[in-house]
Design a protein with these regions (language model features):
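Auxiliary Fe-S-binding modules of radical SAM enzymes
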Residues: 1-21, 186-289
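Aromatic/hydrophobic pocket-lining residues that form the small-molecule binding cavity
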Residues: 86, 113, 138, 173, ...
């Protein structure tokens, strides 16, 4: 795995980033760190009392039109760091009391990250990604990552294309998530803190209840009860510039319909309050750290 023939994500651009070529994500061959923080808004099983040691990387392999982190994901932004510098960032967050190291949108910089994760850290490593991954890439993370936190955004290929430019999102994400669960097995705990396992996130989109039901159906059909956890999110926040129905928040009826389907599929996990759909919960990427 390297940057010289980049096939880290399903777009498989094949560019030589070491020679200055750029693919879809626009990123160089040096990791870009946009922000670090003790993140207390992750799922309770991850945030604990100390917070997740979140490392937000610049750029993204998806480019969702409604992204809350567009300030950093829309282009290659952040401070360049090599693997040694990234290791120091991890260790500093742990010294501050981080419950884990939360790698946020990391795929485009995996070669650097993998080097920084050796030797193994004394806290769990969380791979927090958009779900648009290659199973072959995820396979190379075995033994390095303890907790996978992928999105499963779309079961509808037209929706994946229109909102993220990825008509192949669903098959790619499904294959990657199967590999994640193969590696982690069922969730493992230390008290109320997860130390190993896979949490599948799904963000309900306005006007797209059917998409959400299909996503939950797939999870229920492919994993035994309790084998994975589901984090059902209602935090969609209109960011401007999108036509209806994406110019509004998710309604209570939409949320309740999806929540009922989650329970019908005997899926365990986490849910959110309506107050989460507020721009105040988006990290401030203009601040230092």
């Amino acid at each position: 795995m390297d940057y010289s023939l980049c096939e880290l994500c399903p777009r498989s651009c094949g560019v030589d980033r070491t020679a200055g070529e750029r693919g879809f994500c626009g990123c160089p061959d040096t990791a870009l760190v946009a922000k670090t923080m003790l993140h207390r808004w992750e799922e309770p099983a991850l945030a604990g009392s100390g917070g997740s040691g979140a490392v937000f990387f610049g750029g993204c392999t998806l480019g969702c039109r409604y992204c809350q982190n567009a300030a950093i994901s829309g282009g290659p932004t952040g401070t360049p760091v090599d693997s040694e510098g990234l290791r120091r960032i991890f260790e500093d967050l742990i010294a501050q009391g981080a419950e884990n190291i939360d790698l946020v949108t990391p795929t485009q910089f995996l070669p650097t990250i993998l080097s920084a994760l050796t030797p193994k850290l004394p806290v769990p490593v969380v791979y927090n990604c958009g779900g648009y991954e290659r199973a072959e890439t995820i396979r190379q993370l075995e033994g390095k990552v303890d907790i996978y936190l992928p999105d499963l955004k779309y079961a509808d290929s037209a929706l994946g294309q229109s909102l993220s430019g990825a008509a192949d999102y669903f098959p790619a994400a499904c294959g990657a998530i199967r590999e994640m669960v193969r590696q982690t097995g069922r969730p493992r705990w230390n008290g109320d803190k997860m130390v190993r396992g896979t949490i599948i996130r799904h963000l309900i989109l306005p006007g797209q209840v059917e998409n959400s039901l299909r996503v939950l159906d797939w999870i229920g059909e492919n994993f035994a009860p309790g084998q994975v956890l589901v984090s059902l999110m209602r935090q969609y926040t209109p960011m401007g510039g999108l036509a209806a129905p994406f110019d509004r928040r998710v309604t209570e009826d939409e949320y309740e319909a999806v929540l009922s389907w989650m329970y019908l599929n005997r899926l365990e996990g986490f849910t959110q309050e309506a107050e989460s759909a507020d721009a105040g919960f988006i990290p401030d990427f203009q601040q230092g750290g």
